[in-house]
């Protein structure tokens, strides 16, 4: 369901100005969440396998099947065809690494635990060049369990106070293709030897396969040009990827670990949906772009199911007079440029909810 009138972005609140509770707060956050879960489960039960998993699996399969066309386009000297190859490879790369890894991390691609593990290793380690264990721990066990709780799931890993607003917003995203495998290798010190060796092998397989295909299929003549093309395709959507990760949580209410609200209040206050953007919805997935609130409330739902339950969730939250944060990419971009010091450099103020 498209928002008819986007809400203004929620501003951080000082602890001396506590937020007023919703009128339905006396019913308790747990009761509200159970009521919403029943409504969502009714939608899930009446949905086919195609709706629950098939649509997203088809998008990922299409991205894999489109890779040969992208590599072959790079053989052409025609600038338009070459640019098409870069675009195909870049969009497919982000579809596999962001959408695929995100769904695999949550076990939303299949109901089989064995296949969930296989897809997790493939998308996170082979495609993304990161560690499956740290992706699961950092994203699922910390960010989702403690959304916007300062020091736990507050998205602070995305803050780089040493950079000014223009360097961060425009230049820092280019570091992502290089920083991702380097961070992964650094974190291997904290895992068992067998796990570290497996991760190194899978990351190396993914990176070398990309490099080998550029040399042997795309026809690049020297290693430096192949590495440059790897960097170009892997950074194609790096800017919106970094921006989205900060737009949807930072600048919204933050909570202390000792006084965090109930789950439904935490997610409705601390999560924001962006307006639908076709390319980003395709490459990153609805659960990251336009259905992020729904995803945080029901993280095991696939992207397509998050989109399907969105009308139910948005109507329920509004009927119960709970926040349902929505904004456009451009509006958040302008807001972060204007208030970068407050959002990305200074310590976030703590929001206290009176009566919840």
From Swiss-Prot:
Cellular component, GO annotation: membrane
Main subcellular location: membrane
Region (Disordered): 1-25
Enzyme nomenclature, EC number: 1.14.19.-
GO biological process, one term: fatty acid biosynthetic process
Metabolic or biological pathway: Lipid metabolism; fatty acid metabolism
Similarity comment: Belongs to the fatty acid desaturase type 1 family.
Name the UniProt record assigns to this protein: Fatty acid desaturase 6
């Amino acid at each position: 369901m498209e928002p008819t009138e986007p809400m203004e972005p929620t501003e951080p609140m000082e602890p001396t100005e506590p937020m007023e509770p919703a009128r339905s707060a006396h019913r308790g956050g747990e009761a509200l969440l159970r009521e919403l879960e029943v409504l969502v489960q009714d939608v899930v039960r009446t949905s086919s396998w195609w709706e629950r998993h098939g649509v997203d699996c088809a998008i990922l399969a299409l991205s894999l099947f489109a890779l040969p066309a992208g590599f072959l386009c790079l053989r052409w000297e025609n600038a338009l065809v070459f640019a098409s190859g870069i675009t195909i490879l870049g969009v497919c790369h982000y579809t596999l690494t962001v959408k695929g890894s995100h769904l695999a991390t949550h076990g939303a691609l299949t109901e089989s635990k064995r296949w969930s593990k296989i897809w997790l290793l493939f998308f996170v380690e082979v495609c993304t060049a990161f560690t499956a264990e740290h992706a699961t721990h950092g994203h699922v066990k910390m960010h989702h369990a403690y959304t916007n709780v300062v020091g736990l799931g507050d998205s602070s890993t995305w803050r780089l106070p040493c950079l000014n607003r223009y360097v961060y917003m425009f230049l820092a995203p280019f570091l992502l293709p290089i920083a991702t495998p380097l961070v992964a290798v650094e974190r291997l010190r904290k895992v068992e030897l067998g796990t570290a060796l497996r991760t190194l092998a899978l990351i190396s397989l993914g990176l070398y396969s990309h490099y080998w295909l550029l040399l042997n299929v795309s026809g690049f003549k020297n290693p430096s040009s192949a590495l440059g093309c790897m960097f170009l395709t892997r950074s194609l959507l790096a800017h919106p990827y970094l921006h989205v990760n900060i737009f949807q949580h930072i600048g919204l209410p933050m909570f202390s670990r000792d006084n965090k609200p109930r789950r439904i209040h935490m997610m409705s206050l601390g999560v924001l949906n962006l307006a639908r953007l076709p390319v980003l919805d395709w490459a990153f997935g609805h659960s990251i772009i336009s259905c992020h609130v729904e995803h945080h409330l029901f993280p095991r739902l696939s992207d397509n199911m998050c989109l399907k339950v969105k009308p139910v969730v948005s109507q329920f939250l509004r009927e119960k007079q709970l926040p349902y944060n929505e904004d456009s990419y451009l509006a958040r971009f302008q807001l972060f440029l204007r208030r970068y010091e407050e959002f990305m450099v200074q310590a976030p103020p703590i929001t206290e909810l009176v009566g919840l």
